[in-house]
């Protein structure tokens, strides 16, 4: 069968790489893909942008694609799933209505409140003055979020009132996040440890994926501004069996049932960003309506199941007939980024030292890369590569990932040196 993966990041390289391992599959197309997918013998890039929905549908119909898997959020919010389904094409992802869970933070917070799903106390604002009054009433630390899609960067964790007020001005009066920031959510600062809890949903049944933990801040020990994610590992030891059960009972099931009851039946990957307190109680920080990036990369490295088989079962409403199998080992991915990210950065730098053949128990997934006219791999984004490895412990996986990246370099590249530090501290204790 033929599979189409929509997207051009590290997540899509990992999903397409995993899909191509399925015995059911003869061809995997990636639209538009990147240099990593271009260089994979089992994958084929297609030059169509992720939000060019008519062109994506045309291609899928002409090529008789049997299954489409959507990577990024933008086409989901624009209704790619609705369009494909209306044309009778099999596609795994949520409808535009269901994708509001990521497309609007205000929608999500109101939804969580309606269904008594644990989350931070909050209020939505469109005007500066009432927002500032609320800040002064609540005090810092406090969290300010742009309502719409901001590539994972529209969240300011303000440790002082001045910082919080500046963020409100930037978003509502300034134009820090364009349309995404015309409405903001201000919410209480939650203490605890974060985890990424990702499941597959077929509208009614849920199949949990492996747990993971992302590293949002740009600097070591979680300092500096938020990014799309600087690295991740799986599994996340903070998600104990108890926490797993609580998350399913208090968050995932009520969300799936609540969406269905409101006429937005959810199918696709559902990613709950959790904050877990000292007592092991999870609260929702955010929902994403797709797999996380960079969490996908270490999770796919651990996945033993057939991803395509699971997606097909989900499209047919038969996820309850499937289980997922995982490598017992831990896996860890480190993002190599362009200097200046998440602010302004340069593109077009030649990347040296990429491994020429497959690495045992490791993989270099490409994100912001492209093939130049002379076939050299050059940078084309802020997050450029995700260097991922397996190990019997998180510490061993970390050591292997950093070793795998030793020879890879370009002008002004950087990475965090401490990905996995929370899990490694746990292992040492």
Curated annotation (Swiss-Prot):
GO terms for biological process: 'de novo' IMP biosynthetic process; purine nucleobase biosynthetic process. It catalyses: 5-phospho-beta-D-ribosylamine + glycine + ATP = N(1)-(5-phospho-beta-D-ribosyl)glycinamide + ADP + phosphate + H(+). Pfam families: GARS_A, GARS_C, GARS_N. Binds 1 Mg(2+) or Mn(2+) ion per subunit. Its cofactor is Mg(2+); Mn(2+). This is Phosphoribosylamine--glycine ligase. Mg(2+) binds at residues 286, 288. Residues 212-237 are annotated as: Disordered. ATP binds at residues 135-196. Residues 109-316 form the ATP-grasp domain. Residues 213-223 have a biased composition (Basic and acidic residues). Monomer. Its EC number is 6.3.4.13. The keyword Cell wall biogenesis/degradation does not apply. Keywords: ATP-binding, Ligase, Magnesium, Manganese, Metal-binding, Nucleotide-binding, Purine biosynthesis. SMART domains: GARS_A (SM01209), GARS_C (SM01210). GO terms for molecular function: ATP binding; metal ion binding; phosphoribosylamine-glycine ligase activity. The lineage of its organism: Bacteria, Pseudomonadati, Pseudomonadota, Gammaproteobacteria, Enterobacterales. Pathway: Purine metabolism; IMP biosynthesis via de novo pathway; N(1)-(5-phospho-D-ribosyl)glycinamide from 5-phospho-alpha-D-ribose 1-diphosphate: step 2/2. Belongs to the GARS family.
């Amino acid at each position: 069968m033929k599979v189409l993966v929509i997207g051009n990041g590290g997540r899509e390289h990992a999903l397409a790489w995993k899909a191509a391992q399925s015995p059911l599959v003869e061809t995997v197309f990636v639209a538009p893909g990147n240099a990593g997918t271009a260089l994979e013998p089992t994958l084929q890039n297609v030059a169509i942008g992720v939000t060019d929905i008519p062109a994506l549908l045309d291609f899928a119909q002409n090529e008789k694609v049997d299954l489409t898997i959507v990577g990024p959020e933008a086409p989901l919010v624009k209704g790619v799933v609705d369009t494909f389904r209306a044309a009778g094409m099999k596609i795994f992802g949520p409808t535009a209505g269901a994708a509001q869970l990521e497309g609007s933070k205000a929608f999500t917070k109101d939804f969580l409140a309606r269904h008594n799903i644990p989350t931070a106390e909050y209020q939505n604002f469109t005007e500066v003055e009432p927002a500032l009054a609320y800040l002064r009433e609540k005090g810092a630390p406090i969290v300010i979020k742009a309502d719409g899609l901001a590539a994972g960067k529209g969240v300011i964790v303000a440790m002082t009132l001045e910082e919080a007020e500046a963020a409100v001005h930037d978003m509502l009066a300034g134009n820090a996040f364009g349309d995404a920031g015309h409405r903001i959510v201000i919410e209480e600062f939650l203490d605890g440890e974060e985890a990424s809890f990702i499941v597959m949903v077929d509208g009614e049944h849920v199949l949990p994926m492996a747990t993971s933990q992302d590293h949002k801040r740009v600097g070591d020990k979680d300092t500096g501004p938020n990014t799309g994610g600087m690295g991740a590992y799986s599994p996340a030891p903070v998600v104990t069996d108890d926490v797993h059960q609580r998350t399913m009972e208090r968050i995932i099931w009520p969300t799936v049932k609540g969406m269905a009851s409101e006429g937005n039946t959810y199918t696709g990957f559902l990613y709950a960003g959790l904050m877990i307190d000292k007592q092991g109680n999870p609260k929702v920080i955010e929902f994403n309506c797709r797999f996380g990036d960079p969490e996908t990369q270490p999770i796919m490295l651990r996945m033993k199941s057939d991803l395509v088989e699971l997606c097909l079962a989900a499209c047919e409403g038969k996820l309850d007939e499937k289980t997922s199998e995982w490598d017992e080992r831990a896996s860890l991915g480190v993002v190599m980024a362009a200097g200046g990210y998440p602010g302004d950065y340069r593109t077009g730098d030649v990347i040296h030292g990429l491994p020429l053949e497959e690495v045992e128990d490791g993989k270099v997934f490409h994100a912001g890369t492209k093939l130049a006219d002379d076939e050299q791999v050059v940078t084309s984004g802020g997050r450029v590569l995700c260097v991922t490895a397996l190990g019997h412990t998180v510490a061993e996986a970390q050591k292997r990932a950093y070793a795998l990246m030793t020879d890879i370099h370009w002008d002004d590249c950087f990475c965090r040196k401490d990905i996995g530090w929370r899990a490694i501290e746990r292992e040492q204790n």
